[in-house]
Curated annotation (Swiss-Prot):
The keyword Transferase does not apply. Coiled coil: none annotated. SUPFAM superfamilies: Cytochrome P450. Its cofactor is heme. It comes from Oryza sativa subsp. japonica (Rice). This is Ent-isokaurene C2/C3-hydroxylase. Its EC number is 1.14.14.76. Its main location: membrane. Pfam families: p450. Enzyme of the diterpenoid metabolism involved in the biosynthesis of antibacterial oryzalides such as phytocassane. Belongs to the cytochrome P450 family. It catalyses: ent-isokaurene + 2 reduced [NADPH--hemoprotein reductase] + 2 O2 = ent-isokaurene-2beta,3beta-diol + 2 oxidized [NADPH--hemoprotein reductase] + 2 H2O + 2 H(+).
Length: 515
């Protein structure tokens, strides 16, 4: 009798719980979510990405958007996501409702690599984030600061040109691995600009950075099921990402301490600041730390995360775009010849190019724009996250939804671009479209509050190397390869780099100076 009473009470309690949930659910207003493909338990929409048979996520998402529209709802495991594939929707999200979508989507791996979101690239929108970004914009990445690194860029590019001239003199049809050379160039420029010198720990840092970049390329089980402790335990990528970040953090802390010690020694000797590092990012941050008075104190931790953002961002974007540009020029000999003619006419026989020589090279700038259109380095931009439930184009976007803007798809859409799959720099002639974040059919660096703060630095790191390679060398494909046979597939992930290494043969046209 007593057992039956307990059973009845349990069943009654269960009935009340179920009924209350049903009533609560019925009383909740139904959300008008964007259209999207049908989902499966647990995995959500992931099977649709597999069914498109494209290894690149941005291509798979374009195929799905062509069926479901320019604003599309997906479920990446338990994570709600919206994919934007038109300029109008992008403008609504990134401009008109920018503040509502000002947070960053963090995967388990990016959270570990980028200091738990305490940096500028992936940090959530907050007072702290705003002050850190202000330091970047007003102290580290101003036009004057970027110009102050002109000598660094010119020296490192001249070094690369001399190395390639030596390769050209050695002959051979196998070609030079430009991925390695250009990556080294970018890393040397950013290291000198960041810490004032080549840095004895450079290789250790870059090795750890390369490992970290590989980990954030693909989704791990912890990214799909962030609420699951078990998924976090079994996921390998976040652990590898954390280990890599700790290695990089240790290197940066060593550099900071070495620089502090050097400045103290210089001060004790009455020498003032060492000229080599006078304008580097680290010296600027150490000055701010010493002066104080900033809304967010510039601690060593702040210096670490800001230097990490500077180095990791600049070491990836510029070489990726430069490799794509050279690959497109090799596939399009007419455009290559036109770009070379412009540079050679402007520089007129000098043995070394400076940035002052290339200010007026309009076609070179169009070539870079066209590369950024056809091969945006971040094809899905850096994803945003909805901070509060919002409405976009009549659809409800719940708080916490991740928002991906498929800039790769928008830049190849025939509704916004004539002959979108063709490489035509002339499309930007007498055209006001630029990459400053106001033309929503062309946002290679993003838009709004989260636009890339390093646009000026990134473009400066592109123009001089490209002009120098076009000026000093003619180029041919290895082993008699025809231009149309050059592989142009891209990688998947946050950055869409050229999948196959670019090997081409330099032929010296104007010999560089020897020193």
């Amino acid at each position: 009798m007593e057992d039956k009473l307990i059973l009845d009470l349990c069943l009654s309690a269960l009935f009340v719980v179920v009924l209350s949930k049903l009533v609560s659910s019925a009383m909740k207003p139904r959300l008008n979510l964007p259209p999207g493909p049908w989902t499966l338990p647990l995995i959500g929409s992931l099977h649709h990405l597999v069914m498109t048979k494209s290894p690149q996520t941005h291509r798979s998402l374009r195929a799905l958007s062509e069926k479901h529209g320019p604003i599309m709802q997906l479920w990446m495991g338990e994570v709600p996501a919206v994919v934007v594939s038109s300029p109008a929707v992008a403008e609504e999200v990134l401009k008109h409702q920018d503040l509502r979508f000002a947070d960053r989507h963090l995967t388990a791996t990016t959270e570990e690599v980028f200091f738990g979101g305490r940096d500028v690239i992936f940090g959530p929108y907050s007072e702290r984030w705003r002050h850190l970004r202000k330091i970047c914009m007003q102290e580290l990445l101003t036009a004057a600061r970027v110009r102050s690194f002109q000598g660094v860029r010119e020296r490192e590019v001249a070094r690369l040109v001399r190395e390639l001239a030596a390769d050209a003199g050695a002959g051979g049809d196998a070609g030079v691995n430009l991925n390695e050379r250009i990556s080294k160039l970018a890393n040397d420029i950013v290291m000198v600009s960041s810490v004032g010198g080549r840095c004895s720990h450079r290789d250790e840092f870059l090795d750890a950075l390369e490992v970290a970049k590989k980990q954030i390329t693909w989704l791990s089980v912890a990214d799909l099921f962030p609420s699951s402790k078990l998924a976090r335990m079994v996921a390998v990528a976040p652990r590898k990402g954390l280990a890599s970040r700790k290695r990089m953090e240790l290197v940066i802390r060593r550099i900071i301490q070495e620089r502090k010690d050097q400045l103290m020694d210089d001060s004790a000797a009455g020498a003032g600041e060492a000229a080599a590092g006078k304008d580097c990012f680290l010296d600027v941050l150490l000055r701010l730390q010493k002066e104080g008075g900033t809304p967010v104190p510039v601690t060593d931790e702040i210096i670490v995360v800001l230097l990490f953002d500077m180095i990791s961002g600049a070491s990836e974007t510029s070489p990726t775009v430069l490799i794509w540009t050279l690959a497109e020029l090799m596939r399009n000999p007419r455009i290559m010849a036109k770009a070379q003619a412009e540079v050679r006419q402007a520089v007129a026989g000098k043995t070394t190019i400076t940035e002052d020589d290339i200010v007026g090279l309009s076609y070179l700038k169009m070539v870079i724009k066209e590369t950024l259109r056809l091969h945006p380095p971040a094809p899905l931009l850096n994803p945003r996250k909805c901070r509060e439930t919002s409405q976009v184009m009549g659809y409800d976007i719940p708080k916490g939804t991740s928002v991906f803007v498929n800039m790769w798809a928008i830049c190849r859409d025939s509704r916004y671009w004539e002959d979108p799959e063709e490489y035509k720099p002339e499309r930007f002639e007498n055209n006001s479209v630029d990459y400053k974040g106001n033309n929503f059919e062309f946002l290679p660096f993003g838009s709004g509050r989260r636009i890339c703060p390093g646009i000026n630095l990134g473009v400066a790191n592109l123009e001089l190397p490209l002009a120098s390679l076009l000026y000093h060398f003619d180029w041919k494909l290895p082993n008699g390869m025809a231009p149309k046979d050059l592989d142009m597939h891209e990688t998947s992930g946050m950055v869409a780099a050229k999948l196959i290494t670019l090997n081409i043969c330099p032929i010296t046209h104007i010999a560089p100076s020897s020193a």
